[in-house]
Design a protein with these regions (language model features):
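Mid-length scaffold segments of soluble, non-membrane domains
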Residues: 70, 81-83, 89
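Short, surface-exposed interaction patches in beta-rich subdomains
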Residues: 90-169
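Acidic (Asp/Glu) and glycine-rich low-complexity loops/linkers
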Residues: 1-45, 49-64, 74-79, 91-98, ...
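Short, surface-exposed linear segments at secondary-structure transitions and domain or protein termini
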Residues: 61-63, 83-84, 140-142, 159
């Protein structure tokens, strides 16, 4: 009932059309393990979870989520981007030079434990982003969402529109 397909170097894992999976034991759920040697992107749509069991080491990693699922990753990369629409959570840890976080909806990007030199964070809606920036932080909020940061960035550029807030933790 689960299909896998590789298109243009991308692995797609999904259920067959009109199939709704129900595990025989809800406590244990359904797990799919994907061993990787090289990866540049992770995308989740729907209500599943993606969890890295080890540190993902790559040059550039893009995470995209739409829906109510959760992504939890430990990353070592030169550049990391996280974008979300919906009500899920993206939780990131590790190290990167450049981190970009964009969120619309009511989800959260929790990246206090992803230490970055340069951070660009954009919130629209009621979502929250938590980041650590060492050199540069560009933060934008429109709506009621918040951006909270750690670190002592040398350059801080912030703008808010609405009741949202940008603050140091």
């Amino acid at each position: 009932y689960i299909t896998t397909e590789v298109k243009n170097g991308k692995l797609y894992i999904k259920t067959e059309n009109n199939v709704n999976l129900k595990p025989s034991d809800w406590k244990n759920g359904i797990y799919i393990t994907v061993p990787i040697k090289k990866i540049s992107g992770i995308s989740l749509s729907g209500s599943g979870d993606i969890v890295s069991k080890t540190t993902i080491k790559t040059e550039k990693l893009e995470t995209v989520m739409s829906g109510s699922g959760d992504i939890t990753l430990n990353v070592e990369a030169s550049a990391v981007s996280a974008s979300m629409s919906g009500s899920g959570d993206i939780t990131l840890s590790g190290n990167t030079t450049d981190f970009s976080a964009t969120i619309s909806g009511s989800g959260d990007i929790k990246a206090f434990d992803l230490v970055a030199d340069n951070v660009e964070a954009t919130v629209s809606g009621s979502a929250d982003i938590k980041v650590t920036a060492n050199k540069i932080l560009n933060a934008r909020v429109s709506g009621s969402g918040d951006i909270t940061y750690r670190g002592n960035p040398e350059k801080l550029d912030t703008k808010t529109a609405g009741s949202g807030d940008i603050s140091k933790d």
